[in-house]
């Protein structure tokens, strides 16, 4: 791999003909290292995310799987190559970078060459692979990778959403068989889509999934295991027979039936989340028929309510499709998609993948601009859960989330939920710096001065929690807080608030006055302790929190 001296080359320059294409030469430090395949060191033409989170050239992963080799990366780790998901956001970014650099887009590498590179690495690898990664033709099921995660937090959602929060499911062994499905080419009258992005906005996935020979569908077959011969239940067979035809009316009826069956039955959600049904849902989710798209999106939400379905749905390639619908689908479909991304983001295993595939920015746009209140509320909850991991916090900050969220707090729009996202962002250095630069202290102090509103108590407590996170280990906070008149407001909160708020306000005042509270009181670990304490006070934890406080937060659709 060459350590830090990686370079990328265009494979199409290796031609036996007299005509060759010459590209401008670049220094290795001009190519962002994340654009290079860790195995070959070349610019990726078809990047994919593997199960362990790294991004590789698809062909590199395929060759490693075929040879039963798991490479040792520069950081000393060995990736899990058992499943791949197309990284369309990375592909779009690489192509945009090539356009700016005025060079051709990278072409797929030569298979024989990549195999030679991998075999050379195998010969030089001092340690054998810890185990053989299953090849595309293997029939053995993938190992279980999901530990049980409790989801027993209180909720004020409807019966559908309450079901997921009341259940604690066992681990799952995800499989991701993808079958090619072609929708009949009958005439139609497309409905007007409600676009949430301007024409100048770069899309990471739009337009990729329109046809049956979509690159996405063909690419995903690499990680599939064929289960088409497995027996069908009577319910699945009834739905399957309607979805497999070419008549749009049959598609609508099949999706309505699937949506109805999975609305309240936990057992049917599990039994109907099969590779066959998911394959049809992928195709129908991008339909230009209003009812087809809406019912497909609602069906995805219903299936995602069961914990053991969450990773399977993400691994089956739904996230890029959901993002497309969130950007340009109908209003009702956007509501369901926001709810689906929220539901899928509850699973820790999905958080990184959803962020990598480009969901953060569309969710932020939906939170700010969607015509649907339900979509905005579920987008906020999805962002909260995604921002529980550091990489997504960084993505949110880079997407300009801080000024957007602070503006919404100032205007009083979805304040309590947005404050939860801000508290997560304040826990990372970039987020804390952006918030302090964005006048967050004065805005939050001003919010504390306000009285009234249905969720004012929750917003009040969350404001204090964000201020506590901002004050920890930051020398700028004291001056900004004094300038905003925070001491007087916090003293009033300390006097009149509940016990949790009083404790937090006291610690902020102590930090402002420069007394006590050294690193042990306001260090890095203290931030996590205080934030967890705030959520646990209502019977929740950071991983369990579903957004329901004081009975005023439920906006998810009836699915």
UniProtKB/Swiss-Prot annotation:
> Pathway listed for it?
Protein modification; protein ubiquitination
For this chain, the annotated S-S bridges are none
Name the Enzyme Commission number(s) assigned to this protein.
Answer: 2.3.2.27
Protein name per Swiss-Prot or TrEMBL: U-box domain-containing protein 41
ARM repeat intervals? 266-305, 307-346, 348-388, 390-427, 428-472
What organism is this sequence from?
Arabidopsis thaliana
GO MF assignments: ubiquitin-protein transferase activity
- Record's keyword terms, sorted: Repeat, Transferase, Ubl conjugation pathway
InterPro entries reported for this sequence: ARM-like, ARM-type_fold, Armadillo, Ubox_domain, Znf_RING/FYVE/PHD
Compositionally skewed regions (Polar residues) per UniProt? 12-24
Q: Which reaction does it catalyse?
A: S-ubiquitinyl-[E2 ubiquitin-conjugating enzyme]-L-cysteine + [acceptor protein]-L-lysine = [E2 ubiquitin-conjugating enzyme]-L-cysteine + N(6)-ubiquitinyl-[acceptor protein]-L-lysine
The record ties this protein, via SMART domains, to:
ARM, Ubox
């Amino acid at each position: 791999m060459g350590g830090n001296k990686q370079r990328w080359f265009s494979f199409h320059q290796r031609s036996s003909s007299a005509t060759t294409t010459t590209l401008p030469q670049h220094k290795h430090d001009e190519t962002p290292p994340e654009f290079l395949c860790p195995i070959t060191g070349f610019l990726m033409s078809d990047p994919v995310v593997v199960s362990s989170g790294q991004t590789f050239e698809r062909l590199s992963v395929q060759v490693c799987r075929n040879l039963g080799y798991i490479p040792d990366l520069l950081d000393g780790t060995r990736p899990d190559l058992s499943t791949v998901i197309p990284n369309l956001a990375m592909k779009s970014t690489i192509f945009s970078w090539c356009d700016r650099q005025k060079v051709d887009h990278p072409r797929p590498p030569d298979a024989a060459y990549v195999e030679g590179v991998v075999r050379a690495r195998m010969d030089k690898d001092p340690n054998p692979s810890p185990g053989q990664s299953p090849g595309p033709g293997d029939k053995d099921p993938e190992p279980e990778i999901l530990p049980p995660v409790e989801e027993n937090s209180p909720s004020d959602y409807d019966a559908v959403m309450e079901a997921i929060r009341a259940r604690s499911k066992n681990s799952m062994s995800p499989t991701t068989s993808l079958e090619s499905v072609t929708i009949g080419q009958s005439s139609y009258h497309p409905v007007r889509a409600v676009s949430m992005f301007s024409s100048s906005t770069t899309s990471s996935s739009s337009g990729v999934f329109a046809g049956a020979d979509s690159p996405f569908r063909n690419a995903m077959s690499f990680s599939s295991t064929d289960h088409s011969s497995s027996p069908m239940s009577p319910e699945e067979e009834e739905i399957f027979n309607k979805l497999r035809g070419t008549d749009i009316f049959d598609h609508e009826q099949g999706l309505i039936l699937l949506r109805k069956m999975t609305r309240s039955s936990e057992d049917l959600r599990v039994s109907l989340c099969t590779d066959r049904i998911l394959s049809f849902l992928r195709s129908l989710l991008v339909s230009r028929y209003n009812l087809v798209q809406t019912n497909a999106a609602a069906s995805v939400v219903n299936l995602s309510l069961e914990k053991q379905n969450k990773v399977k749905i993400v691994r089956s390639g739904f996230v890029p499709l959901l993002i497309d619908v969130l950007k340009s689908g109908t209003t009702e479909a956007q509501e369901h998609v926001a709810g689906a991304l929220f539901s899928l983001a509850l699973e820790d295993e999905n958080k990184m993948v959803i962020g990598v595939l480009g969901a953060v920015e569309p969710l932020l746009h939906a939170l700010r601009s969607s015509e649907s209140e339900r979509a905005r509320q579920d987008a906020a909850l999805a962002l909260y859960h995604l921002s529980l991991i550091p990489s997504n916090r960084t993505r949110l900050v880079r997407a300009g989330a801080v000024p957007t969220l602070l503006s919404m707090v100032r205007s009083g729009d979805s304040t309590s939920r947005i404050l939860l996202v801000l508290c997560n962002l304040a826990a990372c250095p970039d987020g804390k710096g952006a918030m302090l630069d964005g006048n967050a202290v004065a805005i939050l102090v001003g919010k504390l001065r306000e009285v009234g509103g249905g969720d004012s108590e929750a917003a009040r407590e969350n404001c204090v929690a964000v201020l506590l996170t901002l004050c920890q280990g930051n020398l700028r906070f004291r001056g900004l807080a004094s300038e905003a008149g925070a001491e007087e407001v916090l003293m009033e909160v300390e006097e009149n608030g509940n016990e949790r708020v009083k404790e937090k306000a006291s610690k902020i005042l102590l930090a402002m006055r420069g007394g006590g509270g050294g690193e042990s009181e306001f260090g890095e670990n203290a931030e996590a302790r205080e934030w967890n304490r705030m959520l646990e006070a209502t019977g929740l934890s950071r991983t369990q929190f579903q957004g329901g406080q004081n009975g005023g937060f439920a906006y998810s659709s009836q699915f």
